[in-house]
Amino acid sequence: MANNYQTLYDSAIKRIPYDLISDQAYAILQNAKTHKVCDGVLYIIVANAFEKSIINGNFINIISKYLSEEFKKENIVNFEFIIDNEKLLINSNFLIKETNIKNRFNFSDELLRYNFNNLVISNFNQKAIKAIENLFSNNYDNSSMCNPLFLFGKVGVGKTHIVAAAGNRFANSNPNLKIYYYEGQDFFRKFCSASLKGTSYVEEFKKEIASADLLIFEDIQNIQSRDSTAELFFNIFNDIKLNGGKIILTSDRTPNELNGFHNRIISRLASGLQCKISQPDKNEAIKIINNWFEFKKKYQITDEAKEYIAEGFHTDIRQMIGNLKQICFWADNDTNKDLIITKDYVIECSVENEIPLNIVVKKQFKPEQIIEIVAKELNIKTDLIKSSIRKNNIVWARDIVCYILKNKLNLTLTDIGKLLNGREHTTISHSISKVQKILDDENSQEALQINLIINKF
């Protein structure tokens, strides 16, 4: 059926008279590929956001007319052009046009701009996206399992973008339902303001938020150790759950690490699904940079510059985006209108404007150097790591080496096996998984020891 859609699409494009659309638009249409039909909409993939804007800007009505004529027997009358990054969103039913905002409360203009169309989805955040999909599912078992949804991760990994996009998607899909957004400090300030006015104002504040069909509460850790504020939240939480509402929470730590809360509150927070949003790696950061510049077509930036920025800031998306804004500001005010942003340009502007970007590019290590350093840190001989000896301390060192070679040098399992005297794929994969599982428990002694070693590279 997919091939049939492409054939019908190609036929429709050939029928469009040349004088109705530009040569550029026609070339874009010729290279476009049909993706899938969902809810009566045929999604068509173009190369990038710039091409998408050209088609949607001036020619969409003409194109839709000819497509509708060709697809009328298929009962398809709506057509949407998307970019490759949006395919997963289509598959998850997450690509929703942002329209009505009347059912969103306490959403800033910035929050309203967040959506899944401009979010890079990769390994570091994919589980969170899937969890949100389950929370919003019509399947009661899937939805209740994820309610409340507790997303945790370090500062700057994109938690706000994800939950705001989720709120906007839910609002557009459910125009008659109410969505509330609160950040911990903001909730505390408004509670204090209501308290000063009297008990009735506190009750009204509570009643308003408790009426939410979806409550998004960020940085829950900011109300720990504030007993009256936490108690109010506890009551709101219970009311929303009793009324069949949904709750998404974020924090920089897991529920069990929120030591300032009473146990009954921690128990409620952990009663649904917990999902970690990891820090993106360098390659994922480059994807984010590419996506960011995709929507800012007037800038040209070299791959070397992207790698330089990603290397320095791939663990903190927020800081990285801040640096991109700073760099684009310099480019906007440069007298060279044909400017290409290079690595050297970024460094020169940083020095000239006395605004350090704090990009620290770490030394590149060779595989043998990594093996030597790990051996030294763990006080064993280098050749023992490559040996077949199965003593616990040697296996431990070997596991760490496998993890670092994979995650720092991006070596294949085959390459790692060759370095370690022909070890099999399954053995290498098991070592990497074992270390990752330890690292997921960030506060364990083993994780702390591994991180001390990893941070040397």
Swiss-Prot record:
Stretch list, region Domain IV, binds dsDNA: 332-457
- GO cellular component entries: cytoplasm; plasma membrane
Q: Which residues form a coiled coil?
A: none
Q: Name one GO biological process term.
A: DNA replication initiation
Binding locations of ATP: 156, 158-160
Instruction: Tell me where in or outside the cell this protein is found.
Output: Cytoplasm
User: What segment(s) does the record annotate as region Domain I, interacts with DnaA modulators?
Assistant: 1-73
- Region (Domain II), start-end ranges: 73-108
* Family in the record: Belongs to the DnaA family.
Q: How does it assemble?
A: Oligomerizes as a right-handed, spiral filament on DNA at oriC.
* Record function comment: Plays an essential role in the initiation and regulation of chromosomal replication. ATP-DnaA binds to the origin of replication (oriC) to initiate formation of the DNA replication initiation complex once per cell cycle. Binds the DnaA box (a 9 base pair repeat at the origin) and separates the double-stranded (ds)DNA. Forms a right-handed helical filament on oriC DNA; dsDNA binds to the exterior of the filament while single-stranded (ss)DNA is stabiized in the filament's interior.
Share the domain note from the entry: Domain I is involved in oligomerization and binding regulators, domain II is flexibile and of varying length in different bacteria, domain III forms the AAA+ region, while domain IV binds dsDNA.
Name the chain's protein. Answer: Chromosomal replication initiator protein DnaA
User: What organism does this protein naturally occur in?
Assistant: Ureaplasma parvum serovar 3 (strain ATCC 700970)
